[in-house]
């Protein structure tokens, strides 16, 4: 049976106090010492089964935010315990039932066997008694009547960091235990039984109580018919009735008499009765226990009479009711009486007859041999159980649980258990619906939300709906403008930690690499995408087709956005500030940011925008009935950075993929919980955050498709971050509330469940380019360069800092000298953790993560070379391998020679005698005819070509949009092989403009240049990608495909791109002067289908050639007639000479004809060389030269290898330049900066770029200049490629992107920077002066440039240390950055590992050979041995490195004391304690110390910064110890207690002085002048000042001298008008504290403690001795002699 009352109870436990509302209504009992508050209405609806009416006795309880965060609420309820009825809160509690009576509800239960019924009654009685005791304890605790053993002593609350009851000061291990305990003091009306009006402390106890009243017994015994309400009752039943089955309550009890064991305590007691009965049945004769008396009597009375009359002793009877034994003393009787107890502790002499008392004793534990001291408080004990109980309760918030495998520590044991699973790799919790596994059940509960469709959290600003509350809280940061995460390398800011982590990868290298093809990337999802697309063994991801056209995509969201933008256009977005319209919400957001200056998070801008937004703009259009919106909606996984209503145009991904920004990389594997610093733990669902609300949404009436994980290909690759003004870098996808369009219930899933990976706003090229008059100029001021402070010339480093660095180095080296002197002992010990060794190099570390990072990025030996799949050549960079495959691979050169690709049109070329290409025509078969390659481009594809300047000498081609010409001028369309004509221009004529077209007649461009139109013929645009027509290459950027077909297309080039290699595939037509035409790489282009024709202006001297035969002519009409008549090659198959009408049936005859009749076409280099390379055009006369050529050029042999790494090359000078990186020898330094180079060419390029800044190459379209031709090529491809839609308003330059225009404006038209307020540039009028040479500069930028060029600062590039001269810098580099030098040769290395490797390879065997040749007794035996293995060597550095591989380390032990350390510097600093050496001196005062850390600590005295602030009174100090000491004045805590007396103090030094002066009799410090002895050195120094007439403390104002520093500080106040001390009882102020104390005693005699009436102004600065003391005082008092130990 079920009870509706139980079903109506809330599901969540009351222990979740964070989920409660900030205000509660509780009914307190009548109190005698508290007032009655008025009624307060609660804003929270009650969910209790019996609503309690508001009565006059209600008490308001408020919630306060905890320290963990503003979202966590901690409720402190201040009332006392009591049992009340809902109707009458002022009534007394209900009368309790007598112990013998039972409640009516209990009698209604099912009768049980006698033993079970009695056992359950005992349980109920125990519960009643426990409840009565708890209530009584609560009342007693409220009145302060008693204190438990584990309670905190009043006044020491701040010492313990735990869960403490505010009423009775009791501590608990868990917060839930405290919350449950608080219900004793403050009864919860929701935990009151509606039948008996009894209060309980938890819902589980209330539920058990209700089940017991109803008689529902859910726990059944599997072996009998017994059933119980509680599980514990069933356990007790199993232990008592079924002994054979092991149970929690099953235990063994031994008989103290015969040691027989029993499982039941009752059986033991019955057994003990048998011993007593046996003793009573057969009583033994009583013998006198007095010495020398042999009296014995069976009669008890006679024996007692004998003792009394004979010995005068009264016998003591055993206290047991049935034991007849008699004893002489009470102690002997008590010792015997314990044998009647059933339970005896095996560890001590404790015995009892109560089983629960015996169990309680065992739980308390027993003291051990070792004293256990608490590390957080003075508690100490020998009992490990008491110690664990103390730490667990009193310091529950401390990190007391330590991982034995690593340094992880936590305050919660469950967290440690979960952490331990990291080391074992176990994931015990598995999802029942998928393969997801996790380590903690909380992770599994969060994961289960991925399988549900309920989204209970919705943003009130924009309608964003999600399943996780944490996602909503992170999402609300967008609306609040909380961009809390900022990149430390640029100005990027975002609101999510995972976005920042993804962004930081832009500043890093490519650390991830594919193991199959060496593909490198930065992000893990990129590698997964690559593996899935390139090496996935299964079927590829499915393609989602468009319902209206042939568009397909693997991303379903891209298809939906495509349909909306291209076909349906159901959702259109309008800008309220202009006429801009788009079908993509992200594009609208990007428009607002660029056109109207919207900054994400600017709420004022959003309000202004909302005021101008027309009504109804927030509502989306209603889809027509014939559309198909329902089957296109799918639930997508959402993220915190998601924005609703986002529709992404797929054309943006197709045409402008480089504009896409970074994506979310914070997905968990199998889970959607976000990663990051602040996304680590999801709060409980009961938490309520400001700015959000919790909604319980009903199920929608729309059937959605199943939720599927997006494929890996859905993640787009991150493009480089574009140049944006400061302040515009916002979070991904951030948009204001006015940008969202909540489409209603029917489409809310689409708007709320957009893929977070596609929500990033991207820019869309404007279809209407702005005119010059409309071009905005406001962005020019955005990029004004203000002179930063750090670019100013930095002052040289002070001498003290350089001295400190030198002393630190000396301290590290001095440790070896201390070992040799015998003052320090060095031993090798086995480390705690094992060492990790790299198998490919000598690298050793103790951290596994460091080894993994080294293996991925730093290991030179592990870096697997990139191998060519054809010839096996190895490369270190992907760039070198790509260049090798494109141009240099001999295998590919042989394969591609004479074997054109079937998809590229390669017309037959004329054969020149004596060339390699002439062999291709020996077969006599004509090559395949050319095929047209249509360029499938959309109408909006950005394929405009760059404009050329007007000064070009060549005539420009004009593209005409005229209709189709007459039939007579058009070519027949039914013969596609006969309508492509290639006019061949003469060599050397180049036209930088677009290749003209007229009647599909394409002139062949000259050598060395390829026109943009020719590039269009070589690629096509299909489904968002640019495809090369000559090879399988495809890409997303127009500039990439243009560069590919112009430079790197392997299929178009055929056999080679090397110098001297004959081109076999291009169409070569010899001209009249004997020159050859340049190669032609692409196929011809057909008409786009609209009938447009291109007018061609024929170049002078150009020839037209037939693409299917060698025919060529100078007139177009002759070529057209030739095509109409037909090529003879197609009919007869004869070969034609391209220079004359000669035809031949075979290729050999044609070659013989060309050699005899046209000798000018043959190579004009004299006689034919003897040897010719079969793979290239190289010729030579000697076989050795040819063999060397083939080894270097075609076989990939690199004979010159670096001895320090895997670098190899074919040139010796490259090896020498490379080796200078390792040795530092032969580096060529720059005379103007600290950089060095291996070759003079790199140095010259560096001087051109950095120092001279004299460019050598210039862009013909704008003002850009560079130092290499590649710079200009890259600039043209990126800034002038496509439509020049952005024109400069101040000059004639035009660009294809706004970013290029901004960069041009900064270069060519910079505005003078406005100086910051208060800067020197603003305060000083006129030009700026150089501080070194006095040069006048008009602007700070020019001054910085002048300083950088004329007065360069010599700075080390590795450590940024400045030097006055070039020689000092060179010496610094040799000593510091090549500090590891070989003692036997001139070798030097930057790292210690390199020197170790050098010793092993060069000098270990040599040293052994020299030792063997000396003829010593131990010849050949190395002097150094490894203590862990048989390794031997002769160099200490090698031995240390080897020992580190065993996990061992060197330990330095002081021979004067027990101090030991692993650090060489620390042992040096420690040794100075015994020697008194103090090399570190303060450069501002006479202070000196032994180690630099003390000096750094001392230097705070000379700084005014006080970063430690007291939260109580505002007191500021420089050291944290001062703040801790000051805080004890507010808390009254004195944690330092003398172990020998009751002395307590709040300072450790005061306790040390107390112990030395009060509890030490030895006076080791003696005065040499008077013979008086002292216990501390401080007292001796103070005493020595009495013998000295010197007064070292002199006032710097009046030159008055003082003997004590305090006297000078007090005197200094007389020279000021400050009165820091004041009376708290009146307005009296004084300069000294004793004056105020004297005033209080005189004028306020009623004040018990005069010191309590003294106050100090916290704003008054502290008087420091060095501020008021004269710089050259008299010499100080003589130092105390070292006559004893240090005090």
Curated annotation (Swiss-Prot):
GO terms for cellular component: nucleus. Belongs to the krueppel C2H2-type zinc-finger protein family. Residues 725-739, 1082-1092 have a biased composition (Low complexity). It is found in: Nucleus. PROSITE patterns: ZINC_FINGER_C2H2_1, ZINC_FINGER_C2H2_2. Residues 1061-1075 have a biased composition (Polar residues). The modification Phosphoserine is found at residue 154. May be involved in transcriptional regulation. Its main location: nucleus. This is Zinc finger protein 142.
């Amino acid at each position: 049976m079920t009870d509706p009352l139980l079903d109506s109870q809330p599901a969540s436990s009351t222990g979740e106090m964070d989920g409660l509302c900030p205000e509660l209504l509780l009914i307190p009992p009548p109190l005698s010492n508290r007032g009655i508050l008025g009624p307060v209405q609660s804003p929270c609806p009650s969910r209790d089964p019996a609503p309690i009416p508001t009565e006059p006795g209600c008490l308001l309880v408020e919630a306060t935010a905890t320290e963990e965060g503003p979202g966590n609420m901690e409720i402190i309820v201040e009332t006392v315990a009591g049992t009340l009825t809902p109707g009458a809160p002022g009534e007394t509690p209900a009368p309790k039932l007598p112990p013998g009576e039972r409640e009516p509800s209990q009698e209604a239960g099912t009768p049980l066997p006698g033993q079970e019924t009695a056992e359950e009654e005992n349980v109920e009685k125990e519960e009643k008694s426990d409840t009565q005791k708890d209530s009584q304890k609560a009342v007693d605790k409220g009145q302060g009547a008693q204190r438990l053993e584990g309670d905190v002593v009043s006044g020491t609350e701040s010492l313990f960091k735990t869960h403490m009851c505010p009423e009775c000061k009791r501590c608990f291990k868990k917060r839930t235990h405290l919350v449950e305990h608080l219900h004793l003091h403050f009864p919860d009306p929701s935990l009151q039984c509606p039948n008996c009006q009894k209060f309980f402390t938890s819902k589980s106890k209330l539920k058990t109580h209700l089940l017991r009243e109803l008689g529902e017994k859910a726990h059944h015994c599997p072996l009998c018919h017994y059933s119980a309400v509680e599980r514990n009752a069933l356990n007790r039943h199993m232990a008592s009735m079924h002994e054979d089955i092991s149970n929690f309550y099953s235990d063994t009890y031994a008989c103290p008499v015969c040691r027989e064991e029993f499982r039941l305590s009752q059986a033991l007691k019955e057994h003990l009765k048998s011993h007593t009965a046996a003793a009573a049945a057969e009583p033994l004769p009583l013998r006198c226990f007095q010495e020398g008396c042999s009296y014995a009597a069976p009669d008890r009375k006679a024996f007692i009479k004998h003792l009394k009359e004979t010995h005068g002793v009264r016998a003591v009877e055993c206290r047991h009711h049935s034991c007849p034994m008699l004893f002489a003393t009470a102690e002997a009787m008590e010792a015997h009486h314990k044998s009647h107890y059933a339970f005896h502790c095996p560890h001590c002499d404790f015995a009892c007859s109560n089983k629960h008392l015996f169990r309680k004793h065992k739980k308390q534990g027993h003291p051990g041999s070792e004293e256990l001291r608490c590390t957080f408080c003075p508690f100490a004990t020998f009992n490990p159980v008491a110690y664990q109980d103390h730490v667990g309760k009193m310091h529950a918030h401390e990190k007391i649980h330590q991982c034995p495998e690593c340094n992880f520590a936590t305050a919660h044991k469950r967290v440690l258990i979960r952490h331990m699973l990291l080391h074992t790799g176990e994931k015990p919790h598995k999802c029942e619906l998928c393969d997801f596994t996790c380590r903690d059940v909380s992770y599994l509960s969060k994961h289960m939300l991925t399988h549900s469709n309920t989204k209970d959290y919705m943003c009130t600003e924009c309608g964003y709906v999600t399943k996780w509350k944490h996602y909503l809280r992170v999402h609300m940061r967008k609306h609040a403008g909380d961009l809390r995460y900022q990149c430390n390398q640029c100005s990027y800011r975002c609101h999510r930690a995972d976005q920042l982590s993804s962004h930081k990868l832009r500043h890093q290298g490519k650390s991830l690499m594919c193991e199959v093809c060496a593909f490198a990337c930065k992000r893990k999802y990129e590698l997964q995408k690559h593996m899935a697309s390139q090496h996935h063994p299964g079927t590829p991801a499915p393609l989602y087709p468009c319902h209206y056209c042939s568009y397909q995509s693997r991303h379903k969201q891209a298809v939906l956005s495509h349909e909306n933008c291209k076909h349906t256009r159901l959702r259109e977005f309008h800008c309220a500030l202009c006429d801009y319209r788009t079908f993509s919400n992200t594009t609208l957001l990007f428009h607002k940011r660029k056109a109207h200056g919207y900054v994400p998070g600017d709420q004022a801008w959003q309000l202004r925008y909302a005021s101008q937004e027309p009504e109804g703009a927030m509502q989306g259009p209603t889809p027509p009935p014939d559309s198909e919106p329902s089957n296109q909606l799918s639930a997508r996984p959402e993220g915190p950075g998601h924005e609703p209503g986002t529709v992404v145009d797929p054309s943006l991904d197709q045409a402008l993929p480089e504009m896409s920004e970074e994506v979310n990389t914070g997905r968990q594997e199998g889970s959607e919980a976000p990663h990051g610093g602040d996304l680590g733990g999801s709060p409980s669902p009961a938490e309520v955050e400001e700015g959000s609300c919790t909604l319980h949404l009903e199920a929608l009436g729309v059937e959605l498709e199943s939720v599927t994980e997006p494929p890996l290909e859905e993640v787009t690759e991150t493009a480089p971050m574009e140049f944006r003004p400061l302040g515009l870098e916002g979070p991904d996808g951030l948009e204001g509330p006015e940008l969202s369009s909540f489409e209603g219930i029917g489409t809310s899933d689409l708007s709320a469940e957009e893929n977070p990976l596609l929500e990033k706003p991207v820019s869309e090229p404007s279809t209407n380019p702005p005119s010059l008059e409309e071009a905005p100029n406001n962005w020019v001021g955005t990029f004004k360069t203000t002179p930063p402070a750090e670019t100013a010339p930095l002052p040289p480093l002070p001498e003290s800092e350089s001295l400190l660095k030198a002393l630190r180095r000396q301290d590290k080296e001095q440790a070896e000298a201390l070992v040799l002197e015998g003052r320090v002992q060095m031993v090798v010990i086995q480390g705690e953790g094992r060492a990790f060794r790299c198998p490919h190099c000598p690298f050793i570390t103790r951290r596994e993560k460091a080894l993994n990072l080294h293996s991925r990025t730093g290991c030179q030996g592990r870096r697997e070379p990139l191998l060519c799949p054809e010839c096996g050549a190895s490369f270190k960079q992907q760039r070198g391998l790509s260049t090798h495959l494109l141009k240099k691979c001999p295998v590919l050169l042989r394969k591609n020679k004479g074997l054109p690709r079937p998809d590229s049109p390669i017309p037959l070329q004329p054969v020149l005698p004596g060339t390699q290409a002439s062999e291709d025509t020996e077969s006599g078969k004509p090559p395949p005819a050319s095929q047209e390659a249509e360029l499938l481009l959309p109408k909006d594809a950005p394929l405009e070509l760059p404009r050329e300047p007007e000064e070009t000498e060549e005539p420009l081609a004009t593209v005409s949009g005229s209709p189709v010409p007459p039939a007579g001028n058009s070519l027949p369309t039914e013969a596609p092989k006969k309508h492509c004509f290639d006019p061949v221009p003469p060599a050397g004529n180049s036209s930088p403009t677009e290749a003209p077209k007229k009647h599909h007649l394409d002139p062949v461009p000259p050598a060395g240049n390829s026109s943009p139109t020719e590039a269009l013929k070589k690629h096509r645009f299909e489904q968002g990608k640019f495809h090369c027509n000559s090879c399988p290459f495809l890409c997303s950027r127009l500039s990439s495909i243009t560069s590919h077909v112009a430079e790197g297309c392997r299929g178009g080039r055929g056999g080679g791109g090397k110098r001297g290699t004959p081109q076999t595939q291009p169409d070569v037509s010899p001209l009249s002067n004997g020159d050859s035409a340049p190669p032609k790489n692409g196929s011809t282009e057909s008409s786009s289908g609209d009938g447009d024709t291109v007018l061609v202006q024929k170049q002078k001297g150009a020839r037209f050639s037939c693409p299917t035969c060698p025919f060529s002519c100078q007139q177009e009409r002759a070529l057209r007639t030739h095509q109409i008549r037909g090529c003879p090659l197609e009919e007869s198959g004869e070969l034609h000479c391209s220079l004359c009408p000669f035809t031949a049936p075979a290729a050999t005859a044609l070659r013989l004809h060309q050699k005899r009749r046209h000798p000018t076409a043959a190579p004009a280099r004299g006689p034919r060389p003897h040897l010719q390379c079969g793979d290239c055009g190289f010729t030579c006369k000697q076989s050795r030269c040819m063999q060397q050529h083939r080894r270097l050029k075609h076989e990939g042999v690199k004979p010159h290898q670096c001895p320090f790494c895997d670098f190899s090359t074919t040139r010796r000078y490259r090896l020498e330049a490379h080796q200078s990186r390792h040795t530092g020898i032969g580096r060529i330094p720059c005379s103007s900066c600290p950089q060095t180079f291996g070759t003079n060419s790199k140095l010259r390029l560096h001087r051109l770029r950095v120092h001279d800044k004299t460019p050598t190459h210039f862009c013909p379209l704008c003002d850009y200049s560079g130092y290499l031709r590649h710079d200009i090529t890259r600039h043209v491809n990126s800034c002038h490629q496509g439509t020049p839609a952005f024109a400069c308003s101040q000059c004639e330059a035009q660009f294809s992107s706004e970013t290029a225009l901004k960069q041009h404006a900064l270069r060519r038209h910079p505005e003078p920077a406005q100086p910051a307020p208060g800067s020197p540039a603003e305060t000083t009028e006129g030009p700026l002066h150089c501080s070194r040479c006095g040069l006048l500069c008009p602007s700070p930028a020019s001054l910085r440039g002048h300083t950088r060029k004329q007065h360069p600062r010599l700075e080390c590039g590795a450590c940024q240390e400045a030097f006055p001269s070039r020689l000092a810098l060179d010496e610094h580099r040799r000593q510091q950055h090549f500090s590891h030098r070989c003692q036997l040769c001139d070798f030097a290395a930057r790292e210690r590992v390199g020197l170790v490797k050098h010793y092993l390879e060069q000098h270990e065997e040599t040293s052994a050979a020299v030792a063997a040749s000396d003829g010593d007794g131990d010849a050949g035996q190395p002097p150094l041995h490894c203590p862990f293995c048989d390794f031997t060597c002769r160099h200490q550095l090698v031995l240390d490195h080897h020992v580190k591989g065993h996990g061992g380390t060197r330990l330095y032990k002081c021979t004067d004391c027990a101090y030991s350390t692993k650090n060489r510097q620390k042992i040096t600093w420690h040794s100075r304690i015994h020697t008194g050496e103090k090399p570190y001196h303060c450069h501002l005062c006479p202070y000196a110390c032994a180690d630099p850390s003390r000096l750094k600590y001392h230097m705070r005295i000379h700084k005014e910064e006080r970063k430690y602030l007291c939260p109580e009174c505002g007191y500021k100090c420089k050291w944290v110890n001062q703040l801790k000491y000051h805080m004890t004045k507010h808390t009254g805590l004195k944690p330092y207690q003398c172990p020998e007396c009751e002395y307590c103090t709040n300072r450790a030094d005061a306790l040390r002085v107390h112990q030395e002066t009060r509890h030490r009799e030895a006076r080791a410090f003696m005065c040499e002048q008077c013979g008086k002895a002292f216990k501390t050195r401080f007292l001796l120094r103070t005493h020595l000042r009495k013998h000295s007439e010197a007064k070292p403390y002199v006032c710097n104002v009046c030159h008055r001298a003082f003997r004590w520093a305090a006297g000078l500080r007090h005197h200094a106040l007389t020279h000021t008008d400050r009165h820091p001390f004041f009376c708290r009882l009146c307005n009296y102020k004084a300069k000294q504290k004793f004056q105020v104390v004297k005033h209080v005693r005189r004028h306020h005699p009623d004040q018990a403690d005069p010191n309590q009436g003294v106050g100090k102004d916290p704003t008054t600065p502290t008087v420091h001795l060095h501020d008021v003391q004269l710089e050259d005082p008299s010499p100080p008092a003589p130092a105390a002699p070292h006559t004893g130990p240090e005090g």
